[in-house]
């Protein structure tokens, strides 16, 4: 559960990084973050999850993993790839 909790903190911060430039991605991730935290807190206080709750928690967690990795790609890799692709297309003309 420690790994889940550590990643949940990182996933919760993802919309903050995306808010200014990519608001649609940030708004898409917010419902999954809320679901993930509600189910994680219910698991911590009740001590167990039923099969459906467990499946929904893992689904929300993995959707947040995908959104966070996409956000990292958009924020950090895309600015470096974009100038190279422009020079490549300009050289083709």
From Swiss-Prot:
Principal cellular location given in the protein's record: membrane
Subcellular compartments: Spore membrane; Spore outer membrane; Cell membrane
Keywords, in A-Z order: Cell membrane, Germination, Membrane, Transmembrane, Transmembrane helix
Pfam families: YwcE (PF17368)
Residue pairs linked by disulfide bridges in the UniProt entry: none
Function as written in the Swiss-Prot or TrEMBL entry: Required for proper spore morphogenesis. Important for spore germination.
Protein name, UniProt field: Spore morphogenesis and germination protein YwcE
Species the sequence originates in: Halalkalibacterium halodurans (strain ATCC BAA-125 / DSM 18197 / FERM 7344 / JCM 9153 / C-125)
Lineage summary: Bacteria, Bacillati, Bacillota, Bacilli, Bacillales
């Amino acid at each position: 559960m420690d790994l889940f909790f550590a990643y949940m903190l990182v996933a919760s911060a993802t919309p903050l990084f995306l808010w200014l430039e990519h608001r649609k991605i940030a708004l898409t991730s917010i419902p999954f973050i809320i679901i993930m935290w509600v189910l994680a807190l219910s698991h911590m206080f009740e001590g167990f999850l039923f099969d459906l709750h467990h499946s929904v928690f893992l689904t929300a967690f993995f959707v947040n993993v995908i959104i966070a990795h996409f956000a990292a790609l958009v924020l950090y890799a895309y600015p470096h790839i974009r100038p190279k692709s422009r020079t490549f297309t300009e050289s083709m003309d």
